[in-house]
Each structure stands twice: as structure tokens, then as C-alpha cells.
């Protein structure tokens, strides 16, 4: 795979100087056009052999284009904060906004290669990391990202010659880093595993470009031209019409039973039983979150449900059991301008708690397959694709020790109507009812179908949905608390078996 990058590609100075002005002008123009469109973020992944010109090339790119629109990120040793989160959390936080370019050193490929080369894990774990990288990049590209992956290459002979030349030069020996010497000892393994990674992850939506790094002129022009070609192709790509205009009618089957129809909404608790069970479950939750085993876990609770189903009341009863320093409540509304400039999961990744912490999502990433689907705020392909993306997201969370509990609070139409009318009559509850609530009520069958599809496609063994019979608020609140406690205790029990 690397043979063509070891044959001595070179460009003389005259040819380089003649080609450079037009290339710089075209790159800057394409960069500005993409920034003005603000439809795509550009992600440039820098990998390869030490000393092959990675840093020098990125420095040139910052000179050729507007550096104010470029963010260079280096992912070296993980910080304590990063170690307390799922592995890809650090990359999601640093994604550039649409219209901007992010250049990533030490990215996910660097981490997986270093881990395998130095024996931190075996081939099976490397293959898992490769599959995870493919899924991440596919999702980013589906959300509009433009990904360039560069492998800067030197042959083993060229690398050793470079090190010897620099070592013997008193003025430039400082340019040799400890990583240079380290890689000179592991070159064969690094290239062997690098070839495996490139072969598995070079896709039409995010291909690898292998750059011979010996000649600076050739290296610089080649990278610049590849960037220009990709950026111009993105600018010339014909986008489909707005999803709000093209989405077809939803396939609603009003006469078919769904999981929601199987719920016994008459379930209830007496006031006396409620007080007893509520206090017991709150005490249980408080103890579970203080348990030393929580140091290996984080907790995420997702609350979805019909309007007026009592999500807020259930959340307050959960929070009442805890020290405010232990948890955060994240209400999810329509995305802000900054959030629209990112892939839709970005705003949720940023809120994932560190180990030992608890985050409550009042509405969540499931908006993509609920309100966005029903109201036509995204395309049909977007929400259909989202089921797999959400399952992958939640799998990454659980693999990192996050306990994910998901609640759908269900009420019937008559109960919702009564609660709406009550909110309109009581002054201190009036803020809870809006025109949108009444409008959404008219789409009850549409939402019922969307909820059924959501549960069918995203209730998994690792992150199952819990359907809460919420006509009786007391029953719902206790069931929510009990479910959270059971999920935590199951996670603690699994820890013992490891």
C-alpha cells in the first residue's frame, strides 16, 4: 500500500514556485465560499511517519488559507477529565462548526495505532476501534462533514537517514523528538498495522491519501491540490431540496396495536403507599449514587413522553433524593444557532457526565425520530438513519461504563386533555401550556406511530426503554425511581463478575 510513496516523488523549485500562486488563490477562495455557505465542516486528519512533514505542511496550509477559519487540535495524553468520559468524547467536543476547518493531530487513528504497536491491546480490540472509526466518519459525513485523511510516509531507510542527518547537525538536532527515536524502533510494526487500518477505513466518503514526505515541494503541492479538489467538489455538489418540502406523508396505521396500547394506564398508588415507597426508593437512590462502585460508572436518564405526562414532576422527585453536586438536569429545546452548525448528536455528547456523576435529559436525542420526524424538520433519510446512529451512540456510552436508562411516560388522550385544561385555569401552571401543545395534540396518531417505531428500533439489551404508565403521577414517579435503582444495581452486580 505504501510502495508508491517510496519511489522518490519530487518537484523542482521552479515548478513549485510557478504553481503556488494559483493554488493559494483557489484554496482561499474555496475556503471562503465554504465558510459563507456554512453547510459543511472540514475535518483534516493528520497521520503517518514521524519526520514526514506533517507539522510543516499544516503550517503552510495556515499560511495559504485564512488561519482564522482553521482550528488545529492536538490530542496527546488524555487529561483526567477525558479519562472520565467515553473515548470519543474528546473528539466530539473539538469538532469545528460548519464553515470552518479542524485539523486533528493525535486523532482516533493515532490512538488505535499507538495502542496496538505498543502491545496495549490485541488485534480484536484494534478491529473494534477500526469499526468504531468507520461508523463515526460515516455519521459525520452523512451530517455534511468533509473529511480528509492524510498519511505522510517515509520509507525506513529515509527515516533513518533523516535522523542521522539531524543528529549530526548541531543547529538542527533539536528537531528530533523522543517520538522520532521511539518510532525508529517500532517502524515495521507501525507500518504493518498502519496498512491494516488504512485498508479497512478508506471509503468513498472519507478516503485515505498517502503522501510521500521526502520532498517538501511535492508534499506541499500534493496536499494542497487534494484539499482544493475535495473542497471544490463539495461546493459543486447539488444538494437535495429542503426536507420540509420533500418529506412524504408518514405511514400511520391507526388500527394497529403498538406497545403503548399494551400498557395498563389504570395502575395507581394510594397516597399512603406512595409516600412510603417514594421515600424508600429515594433513599435507595441516594445510597446507590454514594456507593464506591459509582466511581466506575456514570448515569444518564432520558425522559421522553406525551405532553403533560408528568416528566417534570418525576424529574423533581429523582433530584430531591440527591446532593445537587452529584447531578445535572439538561432541558432540551430547539437547537441554537451554534448547535445547528454541528452534527445533531454533538450537543448531547457535550453533556455526557464524567464517572461518578448523573445527568438527567429532559427530552433528548430522540427528538430526531419524534418531533423532527413528525413535524418534517429533517428529511426521511435523516430520521431513518438516526435509529442506527443512536444505538451506536448508546453502545459507546455503555461500553465506557455509563448506565443508560430511558423512560417514555405515557398517558391517554383524555388525561392529557384534562391536564391541559387544568393548566389553563391555574395561574401558576399556565406557563406550562402553549399553542404548540394544542397543535401537537392534533397529531396524536402520528406521534403514537413514531413512538412505536422508536421503541422497536432502539430498545436494546444495553439501553432498554422503560414504558411508564403515567395516568397516575404517583405510580409513575415511584416506577421511575425503582427502575433507575435496578439499573444501577445490575451494573454493580456485573462489575463483580468481571
From Swiss-Prot:
The highest taxon in the source lineage is: Bacteria
Cited InterPro entries? P-loop_NTPase (IPR027417), PolyP_AMP_Tfrase (IPR022489), PPK2-related (IPR022488)
Decide whether keyword Repeat is in the record. Answer: yes
Q: Where is this region: PPK2 2?
A: 269-491
Q: Which terms under GO biological process does the entry name?
A: polyphosphate metabolic process
PANTHER family referenced in this protein's UniProt entry, alphabetically: POLYPHOSPHATE:AMP PHOSPHOTRANSFERASE (PTHR34383:SF3), POLYPHOSPHATE:AMP PHOSPHOTRANSFERASE-RELATED (PTHR34383)
| Protein name as it appears in the record | Polyphosphate:AMP phosphotransferase
Amino acid at each position: 500500500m505504501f510502495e508508491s510513496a517510496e519511489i522518490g516523488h519530487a518537484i523542482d523549485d521552479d515548478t513549485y514556485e510557478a504553481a503556488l500562486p494559483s493554488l493559494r488563490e483557489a484554496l482561499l477562495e474555496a475556503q471562503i465560499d465554504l465558510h459563507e455557505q456554512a453547510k459543511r465542516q472540514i475535518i483534516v486528519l493528520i497521520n503517518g511517519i514521524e519526520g514526514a512533514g506533517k507539522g510543516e505542511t499544516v503550517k503552510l496550509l495556515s499560511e495559504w488559507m485564512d488561519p482564522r477559519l482553521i482550528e488545529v487540535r492536538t490530542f496527546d495524553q488524555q487529561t483526567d477529565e477525558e479519562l472520565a468520559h467515553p473515548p470519543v468524547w474528546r473528539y466530539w467536543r473539538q469538532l469545528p462548526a460548519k464553515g470552518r476547518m479542524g485539523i486533528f493531530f493525535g486523532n482516533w487513528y493515532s490512538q488505535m495505532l499507538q495502542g496496538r504497536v505498543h502491545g496495549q491491546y490485541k488485534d480484536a480490540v484494534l478491529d473494534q476501534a477500526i469499526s468504531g472509526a468507520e461508523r463515526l466518519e460515516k455519521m459525520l459525513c452523512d451530517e455534511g462533514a468533509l473529511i480528509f485523511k492524510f498519511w505522510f510516509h517515509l520509507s525506513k531507510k529515509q527515516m533513518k537517514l533523516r535522523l542521522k542527518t539531524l543528529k549530526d547537525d548541531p543547529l538542527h538536532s533539536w528537531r528530533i523528538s523522543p517520538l522520532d527515536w521511539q518510532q525508529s524502533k517500532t517502524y515495521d510494526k507501525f507500518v504493518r498495522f498502519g496498512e491494516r487500518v488504512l485498508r479497512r477505513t478508506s471509503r468513498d466518503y472519507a478516503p485515505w491519501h498517502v503522501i510521500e514526505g521526502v520532498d517538501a515541494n511535492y508534499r506541499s503541492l500534493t496536499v494542497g491540490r487534494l484539499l482544493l479538489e475535495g473542497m471544490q467538489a463539495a461546493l459543486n455538489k447539488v444538494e437535495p431540496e429542503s426536507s420540509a418540502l420533500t418529506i412524504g406523508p408518514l405511514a400511520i396505521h391507526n388500527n394497529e396495536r403498538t406497545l403503548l396500547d399494551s400498557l395498563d394506564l389504570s395502575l395507581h398508588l394510594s397516597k399512603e403507599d406512595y409516600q412510603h415507597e417514594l421515600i424508600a426508593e429515594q433513599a435507595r437512590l441516594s445510597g446507590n449514587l454514594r456507593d464506591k462502585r459509582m466511581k466506575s460508572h456514570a448515569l444518564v436518564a432520558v425522559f421522553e413522553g406525551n405532553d403533560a405526562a408528568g416528566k417534570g414532576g418525576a424529574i423533581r422527585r429523582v433530584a430531591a433524593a440527591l446532593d445537587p453536586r452529584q447531578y445535572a438536569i439538561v432541558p432540551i429545546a430547539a437547537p441554537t444557532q451554534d448547535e445547528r452548525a454541528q452534527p445533531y448528536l454533538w450537543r448531547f455528547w457535550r453533556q455526557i457526565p464524567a464517572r461518578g456523576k448523573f445527568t438527567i435529559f429532559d427530552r433528548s436525542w430522540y427528538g430526531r425520530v419524534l418531533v423532527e420526524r413528525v413535524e418534517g424538520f429533517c428529511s426521511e433519510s435523516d430520521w431513518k438513519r438516526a435509529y442506527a446512529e443512536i444505538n451506536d451512540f448508546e453502545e459507546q456510552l455503555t461500553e465506557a461504563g455509563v448506565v443508560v436508562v430511558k423512560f417514555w411516560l405515557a398517558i391517554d388522550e383524555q388525561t392529557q386533555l384534562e391536564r391541559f385544561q387544568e393548566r389553563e385555569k391555574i395561574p401558576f401552571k399556565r406557563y406550562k401550556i402553549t399553542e404548540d401543545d394544542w397543535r401537537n395534540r392534533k397529531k396524536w396518531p402520528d406521534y403514537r406511530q413514531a413512538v412505536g417505531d422508536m421503541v422497536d428500533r432502539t430498545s436494546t439489551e444495553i439501553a432498554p426503554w422503560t414504558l411508564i404508565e403515567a395516568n397516575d403521577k404517583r405510580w409513575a414517579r415511584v416506577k421511575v425511581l425503582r427502575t433507575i435503582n435496578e439499573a444501577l444495581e445490575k451494573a454493580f452486580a456485573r462489575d463483580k463478575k468481571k
